[in-house]
């Protein structure tokens, strides 16, 4: 898991790839809705194994979303939600202290869009340029 400052270095992805922007994540979720997965986008992206509490998905698009959890920087700096949540940074800031990310949850089906402190740790996906 990486904090957003590591994302912002542009060194996490190989040449010819980049961490998607918030807008690029929205293109993905909008496509899923238009392709018949409205309201169930998370199921279509989640891996078909590895999720706790009946949270496995169908992985219809080969995204293989796994529940790597997240790291909360403030407080103890512990890792949380492994097996229950998958969180991926975007390369877009929402404010000077926060950045956008996407969340898959074992509990609900939409792909959630939220912003969080740049010090926290989330997974990273690379998108081909």
Locations of regions flagged by a protein language model:
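Conserved positions within compact, well-structured domain cores
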Residues: 1-129
